[in-house]
Amino acid sequence: MTIETIKRIIEEENVRFIRLQFTDINGTLKNLEITPDVFLESWEDGIMFDGSSIEGFVRIEESDMYLKPVLDTFAVLPWTVDGAKSARVICDVYTPDGKPFEGDPRYRLRRMMEKAEQLGYTPYAGPEMEFFILPINEKGEPVPEFLDHGGYFDLLPLSKVEEIRRDIAIALEKMGITVEATHHEVAPSQHEVDFRYDTFLRTADNAQTVKLVIKTMAIFHGYHATFMPKPFYGVNGSGMHVHMSLFRGDKNAFYDPDDPLGLSKELRYFVGGILKHAKALAAVTNPTINSYKRLVPGYEAPVYISWSVGNRSALIRIPKARGKATRLEYRSPDPSCNIYLAFAAILAAGLDGIINKIEPPAPVEENIYHMTSERREELNIESLPGSLKEAVEELKKDDVIIDALGEHIFEKFVEAAEKDWKEFSTYVTNWELQRYLYL
């Protein structure tokens, strides 16, 4: 998209404000709102902002940063506030000397995309975004209660939530994001939105937009949408399974018609790389304390480091489709992650597998959830970290994933995770009160 096209859209749509969007290291979408006149005057050189108050960015003595709009991401928001139309554009973050900011999560993914392209690959991804829709109280605060007791693919006649999902799909289509499906998920009040796959970078941009639209539509209907991985005990948590493939030109590099399973060496090496780095990856793809309440046996979440052709109890599943649709599904990520950092780390792990020809173990087609510990030991099946603390310790030992994050983000990321863990470790929970108060 050219600046001339954007100028025409601004005039035709009577856009009054433009939101410059970027993402902090926690994955939180930030924005600076400016007028179209300021945007058209400043887009090329960048718009200055104070980076010292953004989580994981810079200290107060080096606070000046610049937002440079990525013009192809310009879109008019399909809702108004007080009748005024706004547009948004996603931005890259730059330092005052004109260099990409090392702490910008989007830059870390761009860097890994460039590495893949140097190897001759274009990486594609498509995530499945799961979330809960909850009621709110008179103060507008979310209430941790179910709105419905529906299950997987259930139809809820005349349900307000059905209207929310439709409005989400319509809004995303207006913003240029193709929605392939929306449906009720396994847990009560849990839902999923699937959108068309694209390159890793464009998909990460789209995922941030999808989360914004989901939350906005829920608010308009008087509800709260949460991407918390495990808000309720005893039911499935919300994951973000990621389907991914590598292409060379218009050919899927993961497909080999001469292989008995139709799978190329490159796919196997890519799988081998992810499995090798899976423990460290967990810190990035499952970055909250609550993430590890989801990663437990019995709730369809992966726990064991393995791969399979079709078996959903494995960490990596290869769906049955072949040809251009050949892909792997990485099942551990959850929607609390910073998707730019998660994609950068996953891509780094997979490319490490290809570069170093890391052979994965044999695929496991048994139900791993039903295996004994002796059987898992016999097959050398290890487990993902059981807590954020364990995952961060694994991350500290993994140079490939550290390099993908960059030293700046790695240090800030670990610092934030360890602070959360320390606070959580001293916090007295309701479970403890219920269990021990009468001692």
Curated annotation (Swiss-Prot):
| Gene Ontology molecular function, alphabetical | ATP binding; glutamine synthetase activity; metal ion binding
Please tell me where L-glutamate binds in this chain.
Answer: N236, G237, R294, E300, R312, R331
Superkingdom per UniProt? Bacteria
Q: Which residues bind Mg(2+) 2?
A: E130, E185, E192
User: Which residues does the record give as Mg(2+) 1 binding sites?
Assistant: E128, H241, E329
Q: What range(s) does the GS beta-grasp domain occupy? A: 13-98
> Which GO terms of the cellular component aspect does the record hold?
cytoplasm
Pfam families to which the protein is assigned, alphabetical: Gln-synt_C, Gln-synt_N
* Listed SUPFAM superfamilies: Glutamine synthetase, N-terminal domain (SSF54368), Glutamine synthetase/guanido kinase (SSF55931)
What this protein needs as a cofactor is: Mg(2+)
Which InterPro entries does this UniProt record tie to the protein?
Gln_synt_N, Gln_synt_N_sf, Gln_synth/guanido_kin_cat_dom, Gln_synth_cat_dom, Gln_synth_gly_rich_site, Gln_synth_I, Gln_synth_N_conserv_site
Enzyme Commission numbers on file: 6.3.1.2
Question: How is the co-factor bound, per the entry?
Answer: Binds 2 Mg(2+) ions per subunit.
Which GO BP terms apply?
Answer: glutamine biosynthetic process
Hey, where's the site called Important for inhibition by glutamine on this chain?
A: R59
Keyword vocabulary terms for this entry:
ATP-binding, Cytoplasm, Ligase, Magnesium, Metal-binding, Nucleotide-binding
What does this protein do, in the record's words? Glutamine synthetase (GS) is an unusual multitasking protein that functions as an enzyme, a transcription coregulator, and a chaperone in ammonium assimilation and in the regulation of genes involved in nitrogen metabolism. It catalyzes the ATP-dependent biosynthesis of glutamine from glutamate and ammonia. Feedback-inhibited GlnA also interacts with and regulates the activity of the transcriptional regulator TnrA. During nitrogen limitation, TnrA is in its DNA-binding active state and turns on the transcription of genes required for nitrogen assimilation.
Which NCBIfam families does the UniProt entry name for this protein?
GlnA
- Quaternary assembly: Oligomer of 12 subunits arranged in the form of two hexagons. In its feedback-inhibited form, interacts with TnrA in order to block its DNA-binding activity.
Which family does the similarity line name? Belongs to the glutamine synthetase family.
Protein name per the record: Glutamine synthetase
